[in-house]
UniProtKB/Swiss-Prot annotation:
SMART domains: GIDA_assoc_3. The gene is mnmG. GO terms for molecular function: flavin adenine dinucleotide binding. FAD binds at G13, A14, G15, H16, A17, G18. One of its GO terms (cellular component) is cytoplasm. Homodimer. Heterotetramer of two MnmE and two MnmG subunits. NAD(+) binds at residues 274-288. This is tRNA uridine 5-carboxymethylaminomethyl modification enzyme MnmG. HAMAP family: MnmG_GidA.
């Protein structure tokens, strides 16, 4: 009889979701197996080697604040860092790091290899072992090995039924040079899961030695480096490399328009939906036909490799046309192409088949995370991965699952959208997707998430002490700013009045001064009124709490009001077909998605406020009838 190894948790796939899931489960005490097609491609960045950007940076901060890795990896392997939207409000500040893709993969692999309770293994999972009560019991690989576990996490990325396209040529692959995973899609379909197809793409890579940099606009990193991780041990000061900017030309646009029919999408070879917010260059030319030019960013992929990533220039054109297309860009007239661009089509599981814990509704103990759930982006994958890892561990250990509410984090917003909206295109997190973005800032991710990470067991004593010390310093600085005053006739008071074009009447606290437009903590420091012992993040934390206090209080009041209503639980066996006062479409959608709370029900596409009102009335009538029956029985 073949030997079967036993684990608590098995993770299938070692991309950004799989790495976070495996680490979380192992750190919570579960014997964990991480299975991957290729041990040399763990934590790989197959598209843009970058972490962060609008809303994505908030996810990276939140994962770190919970005890995850993606932020630490970016801080240890960055080539360049910039804060985007720095001139706007703190709700949309976004840190972005260009990373060294090979170094990133090497460092995360080392972290995984050194993690207690975690074992890595190369293998292709083709089947799931299912028990008599529709519970997962383990997995089987292509070559016949079996591994048993009480929880299995699917983080297969673009590999399920993966097929890459260049022009009208295709081959089975999860990404260039790596074979696709076979069999698992059929297993999921046999178990009753719905699967569908999505597509994404990646641009060509060119040799940095063949580029004319005099024709490009340099994009340097910020002189003052910021960090994703709240743990100073992850911070590595290093020399930054520049990125560059060029633009498409009329020649670029003509070449694309003349050859659209040769691309897999416009040629009709594939019809899977691609990412709306990261379109191919041909999509841009078609959708924005009135634009004369589009920005193209030239970004390094590593310190010691010659490859440049051509951001914003993914294409499905045939390989023999791609070089001609690249050479229409200023600065790239003589460029050498090292890797062609390609599109990849793959199977995914619409995430409405998952609970907000990321356990599937159909099979107990089976979790799904990352690109398999229909998302796009390393940060979205990492966020789902840590949630799946936490909840898989808690499931195995008989503990209650953790649900992240959308009003508490971008992680919660992401998962709530996935589980309640019938999304049929790759999902990318955006600040506009959160109704509470002023509260869900990057700077306060540790305030929001680290206490939960501590409660779960992912934040150790050292990290917790750092957190408490930081919060104490911010609170003390807020107190000082509200108490220390500047007098009208003091030289510093006169200087500030002149700077802000507003007189100081009698005296003003430093907090009053911070509330003035275009006056910041850095200005207090310029007048000798700051605290030089504080870290930048602590100064910003104190300033934001004071400057935006009114807005923050109003939004928190809105959240509290929404939470009171939205957290009302709905019976899991509720017969929506019986609510005849509700529209048929709403009844069908609610019966299909089975929301757990009133808030989830209200966010399902096709369910409007009138439907929610009808549901509330029906629930109240049912409650009254139950009370009357219980009263009659007592009598």
């Amino acid at each position: 009889m073949p030997h079967t190894e036993e684990f608590d948790v098995i993770v299938i796939g070692a991309g950004h979701a799989g790495c976070e899931a495996a680490l979380a489960a192992a750190r919570l005490g579960c014997q964990t197996l991480l299975l991957t097609l290729n041990l040399d491609r763990i934590g790989w960045q197959p598209c843009n080697p970058a972490v962060g950007g609008p809303a994505k940076s908030q996810l990276a901060h939140e994962v770190d604040a919970l005890g995850g890795e993606i932020g630490k990896m970016a801080d240890r392997t960055y080539l360049q860092k910039r804060v985007l939207n720095a001139s706007r409000g703190p709700a949309v500040w976004a840190l972005r790091a260009q990373t060294d893709k090979r170094e990133y993969a090497a460092v995360i692999k080392q972290v995984l290899e050194q993690q207690p309770n975690l074992r890595l293994r190369e293998g292709m999972v083709t089947d799931l072992l299912i028990g008599p009560n529709d519970e997962v019991q383990g997995v089987t690989t292509y070559f016949g090995s079996s591994f048993r576990a009480k929880a299995v996490i699917l983080t297969t990325g673009t590999f399920l039924g993966g097929c890459i396209w260049v022009g009208n040529k295709s081959m089975p692959a999860g990404r260039a040079g790596e074979f696709a995973a076979v069999g698992l899609t059929e297993t999921l379909q046999r178990l009753g899961f719905e699967t569908d197809r999505l597509k994404t793409g990646t641009p060509a890579r060119v040799d940095k030695r063949s580029v004319d940099y005099s024709r490009l606009e340099p994009q340097p990193g910020d002189p003052e480096v910021r960090w994703f991780s709240f743990d100073p041990e992850a911070w590595v000061e290093r020399e930054q490399l520049p990125c560059y900017l060029t633009r498409t030309t009329a020649e670029t646009h003509k070449l694309i328009r003349d050859n659209l029919y040769l691309t897999p999408v416009y040629g009709g070879y594939i019809d899977a939906k691609g990412p709306r917010y990261c379109p191919s260059i041909e999509d841009k030319i078609v959708r924005f036909a009135d634009k004369e030019s589009h920005q193209i960013f030239i970004e390094p992929e590593g310190r010691d490799i010659p490859e440049l990533y051509i951001q914003g220039f993914s294409t499905g054109l045939p390989e023999d046309l791609q070089l001609a297309l690249l050479q229409t860009l200023p600065g790239l007239e003589d460029c050498v192409m090292l890797r062609p661009a390609y599109a990849v089509e793959y199977d995914y599981l619409p995430a409405t088949q998952c609970l907000p814990t990321l356990m599937t509704r159909r099979v107990e103990g089976l979790f799904s995370a990352g690109q398999l759930n229909g998302t796009t982006g390393y940060e979205e994958a990492a966020a789902q991965g840590i949630v799946a890892g936490i909840n898989a561990a808690r499931f195995v250990q008989g503990q209650d699952a953790i649900v992240f509410p959308r009003e508490g984090s971008y992680i919660g917003t992401l998962i709530d959208d996935l589980c309640t909206k019938d999304l049929r295109e790759p999902y990318r997190v955006l600040t506009s997707r959160s109704e509470y973005r002023l509260l869900l800032r990057a700077d306060n991710a540790d305030q929001r998430m680290t206490p939960l990470g501590r409660e779960i067991g992912l934040i150790d004593d050292r990290r917790w002490a750092l957190f408490e010390q930081k919060q104490a310093r911010i609170a003390a600085e807020q107190t000082r700013l509200t108490q220390q005053r500047v007098k009208e006739h003091d030289p510093v008071g006169q200087a500030i009045a002149q700077q802000t074009q507003a007189p100081i009447k009698g005296s003003a606290t430093l907090a009053d001064l911070l509330r003035r437009p275009n006056f910041h903590y850095i200005d207090l420091e310029a007048h000798g009124l700051g605290d030089p012992s504080l870290a930048i993040a602590e100064k910003e934390g104190a300033e934001i709490a004071i400057k935006y206090a009114g807005y923050l209080q109003r939004q928190q009041a809105q959240v509290d009001q929404v939470v009171r209503q939205s957290q009302r639980p709905l019976p899991v066996d509720l017969d929506y077909s019986a609510i005849t006062s509700m529209r048929l479409e709403a009844r069908e959608k609610l019966a299909r998605f089975r929301p757990l709370t009133l808030g989830q029900a209200s966010r399902i596409g096709g369910v409007n406020p009138a439907d929610i009102n009808a549901l509330l009335i029906w629930l109240e009538v049912q409650e009254r009838q139950r009370s009357q029956v219980e009263t009659a029985l007592v009598r």
